[in-house]
C-alpha cells in the first residue's frame, strides 16, 4: 500500500521548493522522503530528477506508486541522509542542483502507535526510524541514571531531567518499561503541569527519539555532505521543528556565509571564503492558515542558502552530543 499521499503538502513545502528553484534538467535530493510531499512538488517541474532518501523502510515501500508515476525521474534509496554524498555517487551523480531536508520525525511515524514515537497512543516503546539498532525501551532498560539525566536534559532541554531519570531507574527495578504509556505515566508523576501546558512527557520523548536515531549527528553530517556536493549556485533548503535542530542549521549557515579563519593578530593565517550565501536572514515560518490546518507547523522554521564558488570548509571536529553507543555501554 502506498503511503506517498498525492494530497499531502509538507510543512512549508511550497516555500522550501521555491527556494530550490527547480528547473528542467536539474537533479535534486529530497533527503527526508517521508510521504513524498517535497518530491512531488519538485517533480511538478518538467524534466527534473529526484533522488529521495529515507531510512524508514515503510516510507520507501510507500513511495512505489510515485516511482511509477515519475517515469524514471525518481530514485528511492533506503538509507540515513547523512550518507547523501555516497548515495549520489552510487547513482553516478557527482553534484546536484538542490537539496531539501525536513528534519526530525514524520507525521506518519508520530501517528502510528506501533512505532512508539508518541505518548498520545499506548504502543511499544520503540522510536526507531529504521528497523535496526537499540530501541527506546533498550535505552530505558540499560542506560545509567546519570546518562539518562544527561540525555533528557541535553536533547529534551528538560529541567526536571534528574528527577525523571531517578524515577525511571526506580520504576525499572520493579518491572520492565516497554510501552509508551508506562514511560509517560512515570514522567507525569515527576513533572507537574497546568491546563494549557505541553504534555509532561513531551521533552523526555523528544530526547529519547533524538538519541535512538542519532538525529543531531545525522543533521550535522548531512549539512556537511550537502556543502560538498552542491555546485556553485546550488540551493539548500532545511525545515526544522525544534530549537536544537534550528540552532544547528542556523550556526552551520552563519559560519559558512561569512569570511572566517583569519585574524588581524595573525594575518598570515588564510581566511576561509564563504561557501554559502544566505537566501533568508530570518527563518520562514508557517502562516496562520497553515498552522490552523496543521498545528505541527507552528514550530517549523525554514532556512536556505545558495552555494558559492568557494571550496567546502574542512569537516568539523567530532560531535559533542551524547552518543547512543556510549549510553548503551554505561548502564
Swiss-Prot record:
Enzyme Commission (EC) number: 2.1.1.199
Compositionally biased intervals (Low complexity): 305-323
Sorted UniProt keywords: Cytoplasm, Methyltransferase, rRNA processing, S-adenosyl-L-methionine, Transferase
Domain of life the protein comes from: Bacteria
Compartments where found: Cytoplasm
BP GO terms, sorted: rRNA base methylation
Binding site for S-adenosyl-L-methionine: 36-38, 54, 81, 102, 109
RNA-binding among keywords: no
Chain's role: Specifically methylates the N4 position of cytidine in position 1402 (C1402) of 16S rRNA.
Sequence similarity: Belongs to the methyltransferase superfamily. RsmH family.
Protein name per Swiss-Prot or TrEMBL: Ribosomal RNA small subunit methyltransferase H
Source species of the chain: Bradyrhizobium sp. (strain ORS 278)
Amino acid at each position: 500500500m502506498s503511503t506517498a499521499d498525492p494530497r499531502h503538502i509538507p510543512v512549508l513545502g511550497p516555500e522550501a521548493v521555491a527556494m530550490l528553484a527547480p528547473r528542467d534538467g536539474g537533479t535534486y535530493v529530497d533527503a527526508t522522503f517521508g510521504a513524498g510531499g517535497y518530491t512531488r512538488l519538485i517533480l511538478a517541474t518538467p524534466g527534473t530528477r529526484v533522488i529521495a532518501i529515507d531510512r524508514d523502510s515503510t516510507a520507501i515501500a510507500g513511495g512505489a506508486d510515485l516511482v511509477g508515476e515519475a517515469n524514471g525521474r525518481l530514485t528511492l534509496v533506503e538509507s540515513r541522509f547523512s550518507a547523501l554524498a555516497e548515495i549520489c555517487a552510487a547513482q553516478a551523480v557527482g553534484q546536484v542542483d538542490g537539496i531539501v531536508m525536513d528534519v526530525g520525525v514524520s507525521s506518519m511515524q508520530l501517528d502510528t502507535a506501533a512505532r512508539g514515537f508518541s505518548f498520545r497512543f499506548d504502543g511499544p516503546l520503540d522510536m526507531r526510524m529504521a528497523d535496526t539498532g537499540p530501541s527506546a525501551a533498550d535505552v530505558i532498560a540499560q542506560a545509567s541514571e546519570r546518562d539518562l539525566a544527561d540525555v533528557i536534559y541535553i536533547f529534551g532541554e528538560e529541567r526536571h531531567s534528574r528527577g525523571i531519570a531517578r524515577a525511571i531507574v526506580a520504576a525499572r527495578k520493579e518491572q520492565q518499561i516497554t510501552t509508551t504509556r508506562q514511560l509517560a505515566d512515570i514522567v507525569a508523576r515527576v513533572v507537574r503541569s497546568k491546563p494549557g501546558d505541553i504534555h509532561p512527557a513531551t521533552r523526555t520523548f523528544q530526547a529519547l527519539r533524538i538519541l535512538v536515531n542519532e538525529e543531531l549527528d545525522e543533521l550535522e553530517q548531512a549539512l556537511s555532505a550537502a556543502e560538498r556536493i552542491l555546485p556553485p549556485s546550488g540551493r539548500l533548503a532545511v525545515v526544522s521543528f525544534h530549537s536544537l535542530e534550528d540552532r544547528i542549521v542556523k550556526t552551520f549557515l552563519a559560519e559558512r556565509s561569512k569570511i572566517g579563519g583569519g585574524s588581524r593578530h595573525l594575518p598570515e593565517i588564510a581566511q576561509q571564503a564563504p561557501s554559502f550565501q544566505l537566501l533568508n536572514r530570518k527563518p520562514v515560518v508557517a502562516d496562520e492558515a497553515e498552522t490552523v490546518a496543521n498545528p505541527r507547523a507552528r514550530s517549523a522554521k525554514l532556512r536556505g542558502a545558495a552555494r558559492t564558488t568557494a571550496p567546502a570548509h574542512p569537516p568539523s571536529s567530532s560531535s559533542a552530543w551524547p552518543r547512543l553507543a556510549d549510553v548503551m555501554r554505561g548502564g
